């Protein structure tokens, strides 16, 4: 493509992170923004220097604007993701959507169907996959240092009570009705990417609300989910949106048949200092060794941190840009968006049923199940 990619943003709060990256990227321009909040829209209009004609209160007007957008980045509440993604795809516009893909299984299916019908690129913006530390883990796995991965942990403990309920007015926000385990892609995303696997069964427990009892299911004190993968591995995930913790943490661990890796449990941030972790490789080490996992991509430009989360958002945006420029499928395509979203939806159902194990359906059109460890599981694509 000659010239610049015309990028539209919907949902200025989260979308502004990618807006800053698109604004600075030499091959992109922010060609339109949309938000139902007039104050937020005006603020980001000023930040990006956009004319009034490029700012919209209605998403349909952004999608229909001329000259036509090449791509749209969706940063709205999750309940709108599927509908807005499908609308853009049907208009011939590429889509990068914030996580998770949808709040329903049907929404995820509609995204897959729209991509196949319209032929445009869809990518889930699961930024944790682009944390540099996971490149180190991928190297160890590809070199066979850890053996076969048999177990993973992915805890996301992030108290955000003020984003569930307004502490002054008591108004409930949309996250108040999102079960903690619904928001699973930050946890299972990088592990499934490293394992090249998908989840076939899920269960979860946790329904008590003692910390923020007046809110919805999003204020459940804590939820624990267990997942079984197609290759027979087990993943454990713990999630809270209200339990007090400083600092919030993403904790990850992978156990293989020859060793393990894990991150810090103390809530290390996205800094140039990286974070301490552990590694053990059988036959090379007498015991687990402490080391520092990198958290910033040293090869990224100086403005790469404008999106936030270190250089993760930059890595996500560049991967999307590469996909629409080359026509290659991103790893985080519509099918893997299903794999990173639906297990959390099924786990939430399990929690409502007292922790019953439930099958996680394969994406529409996936290969038929095969036997793994004596159970039915979906074949790896």
What are these regions (language model features)?
Residues 1, 61, 71-73, 319-381:
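C-terminal helix-rich "cap/oligomerization" subdomain common to oxidoreductases
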Residues 127, 229, 253, 257-332, ...:
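C-terminal glycine/acidic-rich active-site capping loop/insertion
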Residues 66, 71, 77-130, 144:
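Beta-strand-loop-alpha-helix segment that lines the small-molecule cofactor/substrate pocket
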Residues 92, 119, 144, 232, ...:
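Glycine-centered short loops/turns at secondary-structure junctions
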Residues 1-50:
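N-terminal Rossmann-like dinucleotide-binding module
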Residues 196-271:
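Glycine-rich, aromatic-lined ligand/substrate-binding cores of catalytic
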Residues 52-59:
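Conserved SAM-binding strand-loop segment of SAM-dependent methyltransferases
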Residues 13, 128-217, 224-225, 355:
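Predominantly a Rossmann-like dinucleotide-binding segment in NAD(P)-dependent oxidoreductases
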């Amino acid at each position: 493509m000659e010239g610049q990619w015309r990028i539209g943003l919907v949902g200025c709060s989260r979308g502004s992170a990618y807006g800053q990256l698109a604004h600075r990227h030499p091959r992109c321009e922010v060609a339109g923004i949309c938000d139902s909040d007039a104050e937020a829209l005006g603020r980001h209009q000023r930040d990006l220097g956009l004319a009034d004609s490029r700012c919209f209160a209605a998403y349909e007007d952004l999608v229909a604007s001329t000259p036509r957008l090449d791509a749209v980045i969706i940063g709205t509440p999750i309940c709108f993701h599927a509908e807005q993604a499908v609308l853009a795809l049907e208009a011939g516009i590429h889509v990068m959507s914030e996580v998770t893909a949808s709040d329903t299984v049907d929404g995820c299916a509609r995204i897959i169907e729209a991509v196949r019908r319209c032929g445009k690129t869809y990518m889930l913006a699961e930024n944790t996959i682009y944390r540099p530390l996971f490149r180190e883990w991928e190297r160890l796995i590809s070199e066979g240092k850890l053996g076969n991965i048999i177990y993973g942990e992915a805890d996301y403990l992030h108290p955000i009570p003020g984003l569930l309920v307004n502490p002054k007015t008591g108004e409930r926000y949309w996250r108040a009705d999102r079960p903690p385990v619904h928001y699973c892609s930050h946890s299972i995303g990088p592990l499934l990417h490293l394992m090249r696997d998908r989840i076939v069964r899920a269960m979860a427990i946790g329904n008590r609300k003692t910390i923020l009892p007046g809110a919805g299911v999003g204020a459940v004190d804590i939820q624990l989910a267990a997942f079984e993968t197609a290759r027979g591995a087990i993943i454990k995930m713990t999630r809270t949106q209200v339990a007090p913790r400083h600092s919030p943490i993403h904790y990850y661990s992978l156990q293989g048949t020859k060793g393990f890796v894990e991150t810090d449990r103390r809530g290390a941030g996205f800094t140039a200092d990286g974070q301490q972790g552990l590694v053990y490789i059988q036959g090379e080490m007498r015991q687990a060794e402490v080391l520092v996992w990198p958290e910033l991509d040293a090869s990224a430009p100086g403005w790469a941190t404008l999106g936030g989360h270190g250089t993760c958002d930059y890595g996500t945006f560049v991967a999307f840009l590469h996909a629409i420029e080359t026509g290659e499928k991103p790893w985080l395509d519509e099918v893997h968006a299903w794999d990173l979203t639906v297990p959390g939806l099924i786990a939430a159902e399990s929690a409502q049923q007292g922790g019953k194990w439930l099958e996680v359906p394969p994406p529409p059109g996936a290969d038929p199940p095969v036997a793994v460890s004596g159970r039915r599981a979906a074949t790896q694509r």
